[in-house]
Amino acid sequence: MEIWTVLEDFHKTRQLLENASNGVSHLWRFCFGGDLAKLVYRAKQDYREQFEDILRECPSLFDALNLGHQSHFNQRISRALDFTTPGRTTAAVAFFAFIFDKWSQETHFSRDYQLDFLAVALWRTWKCQRLNAIPATCRYSR
């Protein structure tokens, strides 16, 4: 349930994504990242093949993100997240960390922009689902 507490705060969500990414060294993650970041990193490694399969179903996702288009990401990825259990929530965060790693390899955007975009999308989706408000108040329309 600690993961749900972290997702309540945007800055903690951003920090968790960063600490679970490949952009942070193993030593940093071990010493300063915290147990949750280590768990998310491990889940990201364990589910790597499944995450690759999901991204293959959205072949133009990174092209759209690199052009600044967010609607495709929000409709295809964010809406599909499941936060019903701590395990599924961990997998959702691991998937976003995986996307962050993949996107970092093929973009002209800064690492901070990517991290902010993904953290906002994750945090906002979490908040909307917790409020059971996705159909009405949290529609992504860009």
Swiss-Prot record:
Keywords for this protein: Apoptosis, Early protein, Host cell membrane, Host membrane, Host nucleus, Host-virus interaction, Inhibition of host apoptosis by viral BCL2-like protein, Membrane, Modulation of host cell apoptosis by virus
Read off the InterPro entries from this record.
Adenovir_t-Ag_E1B_19kDa, Bcl2-like
Write down the superkingdom of origin.
Viruses
Q: What is this protein called?
A: E1B protein, small T-antigen
One Pfam family it belongs to = Adeno_E1B_19K
* Source species: Human adenovirus E serotype 4
GO cellular component entries: host cell nuclear lamina; host cell plasma membrane; membrane
- Described function: Putative adenovirus Bcl-2 homolog that inhibits apoptosis induced by TNF or FAS pathways, as well as p53-mediated apoptosis. Without E1B 19K function, virus production is compromised because of premature death of host cell. Interacts with Bax protein in cell lysates.
The alphabetized list of GO BP terms reads: symbiont-mediated suppression of host apoptosis
Q: Does the keyword Transmembrane apply?
A: no
The protein's location, in the record's own words, is: Host cell membrane; Host nucleus envelope; Host nucleus lamina
Record carries keyword Cytoplasm: no
* Family, as annotated: Belongs to the adenoviridae E1B 19 kDa protein family.
